[in-house]
Design a protein with these regions (language model features):
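Short beta-rich binding modules
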Residues: 1-201
């Protein structure tokens, strides 16, 4: 084996450095909000990127981004939601906007999405199944929905797993049908999305 370049300068890391995010409802801050156009389908969605704002997991996704040593590192897709806002989905998009308004005193949506940056909102993170590059499946903790901050204390997050087909099973039932364990299934850096430098401000 040939010696790796900069071996002496590389900081050693172990699995103990990775602290998985538990499922639950968190006070979050919006880091970025913009119209997203799918390059393949041309479909427009409203992309919202967030981070944890308070508590033991404050800046969780920012810290993961900064610790990622990959040259093409990107913001973790587990902290991003793509919201449809056309046709029958208008009501759901309005639900998101209303949650932002209710969570930020004095804020009123004026159709300028750049003003959403820095606004607080409740983010609910739950288990979700995904397909790995080798074709096998595992689960990860991903942003599932938004709620108003005043509703956060009443939110009960169960341990159900959202499957790829859209249905739900309990975490124990999922593990019962897979030869997997908790630590092996939570993806470390998961899917990622491209960000700009100002998202970290």
């Amino acid at each position: 084996m040939e010696k790796i370049n900069n071996w002496e300068e590389v900081e050693a890391k172990g699995m103990e450095d990775f602290k998985p995010l538990p499922i639950g409802a968190y006070e979050c801050v919006i880091k970025d909000a913009r119209i997203n156009v799918n390059e393949e389908t041309g479909k427009e969605t409203f992309k919202v990127s967030i981070d944890i704002a308070t508590g033991d997991y404050k800046d969780y996704f920012k810290n993961r981004y900064e610790k990622n040593t990959n040259a093409d590192k990107k913001w973790d897709n587990n902290a991003v939601r793509y919201l449809a806002y056309q046709g029958d989905n208008v009501a759901y998009f309005k639900g998101f906007i209303t949650s932002v308004e209710n969570s930020n005193s004095g804020y009123k949506w004026d159709w300028d999405e750049t003003k959403l940056k820095g606004k607080k909102i409740c983010g609910v993170f739950q288990y979700e199944e995904y397909e790995k590059q080798d074709g096998t499946r595992g689960i990860k903790v991903r942003l599932n929905k938004f709620r108003s901050l005043d509703k956060m204390k009443d939110i009960e997050v169960n341990d159900s797993v959202k499957l790829i087909n859209g249905s739900y099973v309990s975490y124990n039932e999922y593990n019962g049908t897979k030869t997997i364990n908790n630590s092996a299934n939570i993806e470390d850096f998961g899917d990622v999305v491209e960000i700009t430098d100002d998202i970290l401000d």
